[in-house]
């Protein structure tokens, strides 16, 4: 998935809109009543930030814990972020990944369903939704309830989606991932092996899953968010990858 660097700016805009609604409603009150309500809202935010930190600090802590292969702790911190700033939850696909590796699959499923409302064209979102549902119920049920998605032009995301939907193949994913120049191939093969490994794992083929994940984490390693997810996966599963 794409790491949205403007994450907190988007949240700030959402908060501004919500506060605008609050102000319009408050105009029907006395000036004194408005002041009390505004002060109470500000006070609640201040208390939460004193307990957990600012939204930026909480987000950074959650991500850091995740990449330290501590998804359970990471998920708890992401929960704190939602408590401090509830309007940010739809954008938090990173929380969905932490929930998956923390074995909180139903909550992960709901996170990816919510994320679709703000990011409807990212194939990785229905893929992770599938993985959560497959672990919570079964791969067959997950396939029947896959989220609809728009067009994602990244290679080999279309082929990965087809595989998860039951219409594609591992060979087709790898064939498309091996196209382009050497740098493109490395990135594409990192994604391909990550999602092939995830798919193999939820379908019970642990040996194949390990092979794919280690290729994504080592042979075709990338330092972007999803490349590092492969590393986290290997470490969480105890597949003998050194700690970063």
PLM-predicted stretches and their roles:
Residues 67-68, 101-102, 135, 202, ...:
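Register position in tetratricopeptide repeats
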Residues 53-80, 84, 192-199:
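Alpha-helical segment of the N-proximal tetratricopeptide repeat
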Residues 64, 98, 132-134, 199:
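Residue-level signature for tetratricopeptide repeat
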Residues 80-83, 114-117, 184, 218:
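Conserved structural position within tetratricopeptide repeats
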